[in-house]
């Protein structure tokens, strides 16, 4: 259960309604997801987070399905049940297959374990990226 009362689309202020309308148009969805309705209790924060999400999650060097799969990987690592479901649905809508989903989960599980082991052993980095 949410810790704030979700803002209903019909009761939204004009400022919030503008963001809600943009979310629905951009995501091509019929209703505003609960996450955005929760953020709407603070309209300025809603605008800032939506603006950032819209800028980052638009087509770019990474395909949209890859971006959603990355968002899903982070959500799994952060144990965000809402986010896991939301990003799984979004990635599936963009074409993520069951096989890709399973492979993503395997990679996330493997590297969560390996990262914890590297941190636990306090291993010094010896393979460094190129910086041009």
Model-found features: residue ranges?
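Hydrophobic alpha-helical segments
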Residues: 1-132
């Amino acid at each position: 259960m949410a810790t704030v009362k979700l803002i209903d689309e019909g009761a939204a202020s004009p400022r919030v309604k503008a963001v809600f309308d943009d979310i629905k148009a951009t995501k091509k969805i019929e209703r505003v997801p609960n996450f955005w309705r929760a953020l709407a209790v603070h309209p300025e924060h809603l605008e800032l987070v939506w603006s950032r999400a819209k800028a980052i999650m638009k087509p770019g060097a990474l395909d949209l399905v890859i971006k959603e799969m990355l968002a899903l990987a982070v959500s799994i690592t952060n144990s965000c049940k809402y986010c896991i479901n939301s990003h799984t649905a979004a990635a599936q809508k963009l074409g993520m297959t069951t096989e890709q989903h399973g492979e993503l989960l395997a990679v996330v599980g493997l590297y969560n374990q390996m990262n914890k082991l590297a941190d636990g052993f306090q291993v010094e980095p010896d393979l460094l990226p190129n910086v041009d």
